Amino acid sequence: MVKTALEEFAFLIPLLPALAFAITFFFGRKMPSGGAIVPILAIAASFVISFAITLGLLANPEEVISQSYSWFAVLNIGILIDPLAAVMLSMVSFVSLLIHIYAVSYMSHDAGKARYFAETALFTAAMLSLVLSDNILQLFVSWELVGLCSYLLIGFWFEKPSAAAAAKKAFLTTRIGDVMFLTGIIVLTSDLLKVSGGFQDGVYLLRFDEIFSYIPELAALQINILGFEISHLTIITLLFFGGAVGKSGQFPLHVWLPDAMEGPTTVSALIHAATMVTAGVYLVARTFPMFIAAPDSLMVVAYFGGFTALFAGTMGIVMNDLKRVLAFSTISQLGYMMLGLGLGTAIGLEAVGISLFHLINHAFFKALLFLCAGSVIHAVGTQDMRELGGVGKVMPITAATMTIAALALAGFGIPGTSIGTSGFMSKDPIIEAAYLFGEHSSNWIPYVFSILAALLTSIYIFRLIFMTFTGKPRSNYHGHESPAIMTIPLSILAIFALAFGALTRTGFMEFLEETFTNSFVNLDIGALAGIGENELVAAAGHEPLAVLWPPVIVALAGFAIAFVIYYLRAFSLGPLASMKNPIYRLLYNRYYQHQIYTEFFSIGIVYGIIAFLTQVVDVIIDSVVEGIGIVTVFVGEELRKIQTGVVQTYATALIAGVSLLIILVKLIMEVL
């Protein structure tokens, strides 16, 4: 393709925030506002470049930006910007920019604000680098850096034991997924070497275009497990999905995400909207050609996603902490995204479009929800909804924008029209695709999961709105509206939460699908779907109104339930919402997963392994130390015998040693 100025600047997208990290880390303490201006300007520049590239690709989707620098056949650093990467780059940089601007005021009184802005700049750089990667190994390196940054930011207030514990929990839990992801890369590399005939000059096998070109050969490799022939490609994609389960908070590795609320609220917004948790969804979307040739893996993705969406919703309806409700909503919405990708067995490439479209829209209204929560906490000083009430009277802008975000999360709109919130435009197509899958395969489980999750979503988000902003204050707080530097980002995000979906729906999803139709030469998604024997539904996108209305009806039902109970207070839940109720207690304690993981896995298994290894290591170390002591004494005694004090003896030993060295050198030279 013709080189453009934008292509030459593409490498600056992650580099500028990385440089901002270095500058802020070393000099931020001496600068106003902790050096916040440095990452803000850097991320703004990254957004401008990203958005300009996205506009260029909208005009010519096949004109991808691809730059690759190889070191022999084993290492490669490259940039790949196709429609999928372009929209992610624009979203990550834009949302991160607004969060950084908001944080100038939110973190203004924090003594560690310079460290905060340095770490958030690095966090953004790591995510941008992950999205830009043109090969799976480079993506994994950025993936690990994202995990490290989340650890640092969740534990930002490390002097608090709860924050330090939450950071360690997030780091260790996501490591389980990371090990699976790395194992998948190792298996993939081994298989690629097998089917390609080994390393070749000028060819880097782990580039995505190279991986995709060998999918038929990878699918042909089989392994017999308990009498079942399983494709190597199925194993690889399941391992990749295991990595995504950890990063994107899917069941059963979701337990770290609610505790991640221990960091500053702006960190929560960054993790839940623009960086950490979207990485897993992006991984599955980026490697989608591999998944569509392994339909069993896609079905696993669909089931886990659908179940997670419902499972998280059951816990969200009983939480009283403002941020924890939003955390469970994130887990649930990520489940929808995974469900959308998993439905690729039925709707093919459209799965990437509907899932990533929801990811982008979710980033806007989820960032808005968290920043509004931060605005309330910043002004009132508490995040317990039982102590709030009436906040809308003193914080009208925050209340209005958070209500807009709630409408988007619940998916309010008019079916069959272009009238609706961004969440309606992106979440409902996933539910509709689940319906088509059920109609086509008689498997209604994903649809049931998704429709029930939609009901719970509406209940818990409007429960939050009514408990926080309506009624009378339930404590002696003295609230006030946040300053303009905080409310302006809220207003901008509210506009996107309302209108982005309606303005971009059809064209945006078609643009995303261009990733695998025009961006990769010789990539035939139809042929790969045939390898997996997928039976694609031709009716996708043309559903009757009877299919379009149920998601909206359950959203209205959820609103009505929350309105009657928490706004009108027509009746009290009484003992139903108390710890005396075993079901409530089960949900409030999150199904006791933390206790199970801690006591069974951590204490029972891990401590047992540690105790065993400790004994083994102690024996080895003791033996080695004692052995070294014995050998040292023995060698010392023997060497003492040749220390005669006679100069002639020393001269003879020196000549003999030099002669031996000369002989060895000559022998080596002859061999070479």
UniProtKB/Swiss-Prot annotation:
Presence of the UniProt keyword Transmembrane in the record: yes
Name this protein carries in UniProt: F(420)H(2) dehydrogenase subunit L
Transmembrane regions: 8-28, 37-57, 79-99, 136-156, 179-199, 225-245, 265-285, 298-318, 337-357, 360-380, 394-414, 447-467, 483-503, 545-565, 601-621, 652-672
pH dependence: Optimum pH is 8.5.
GO terms for cellular component: plasma membrane
GO molecular function, one term: Methanosarcina-phenazine hydrogenase activity
Organism: Methanosarcina mazei (strain ATCC BAA-159 / DSM 3647 / Goe1 / Go1 / JCM 11833 / OCM 88)
Mode of membrane association: Multi-pass membrane protein
Subunit note: The FPO complex is composed of at least 13 different subunits. FpoA, FpoH, FpoJ, FpoK, FpoL, FpoM and FpoN proteins constitute the membrane sector of the complex.
Main location: membrane
Source lineage: Archaea, Methanobacteriati, Methanobacteriota, Stenosarchaea group, Methanomicrobia
Annotated Pfam families: Proton_antipo_M, Proton_antipo_N
Function: Component of the F(420)H(2) dehydrogenase (FPO complex) which is part of the energy-conserving F(420)H(2):heterodisulfide oxidoreductase system. The membrane-bound electron transfer system of the complex plays an important role in the metabolism of methylotrophic methanogens when the organisms grow on methanol or methylamines. Catalyzes the oxidation of methanophenazine to dihydromethanophenazine. It shuttles electrons from F(420)H(2), via FAD and iron-sulfur (Fe-S) centers, to methanophenazine (an electron carrier in the membrane).
UniProt keyword Kinase present: no
Classification via NCBIfam families: F420_dehyd_FpoL (NF040617), NDH_I_L (TIGR01974), PRK06590.1 (NF005141)
Catalyses which reaction(s): methanophenazine + reduced coenzyme F420-(gamma-L-Glu)(n) = dihydromethanophenazine + oxidized coenzyme F420-(gamma-L-Glu)(n) + H(+)
Temperature dependence: Optimum temperature is 39 degrees Celsius.
InterPro entries membership: F420H2_dehydrogenase_comp, NADHpl_OxRdtase_5_subgr, ND/Mrp_TM, NU5C-like, Proton_antipo_N
GO biological process: ATP synthesis coupled electron transport; electron transport coupled proton transport; methanogenesis; methanol metabolic process
Localization (cell): Cell membrane
Keywords in alphabetical order: Cell membrane, Electron transport, Membrane, Methanogenesis, Methanol utilization, Oxidoreductase, Transmembrane, Transmembrane helix, Transport
Root EC class: oxidoreductase
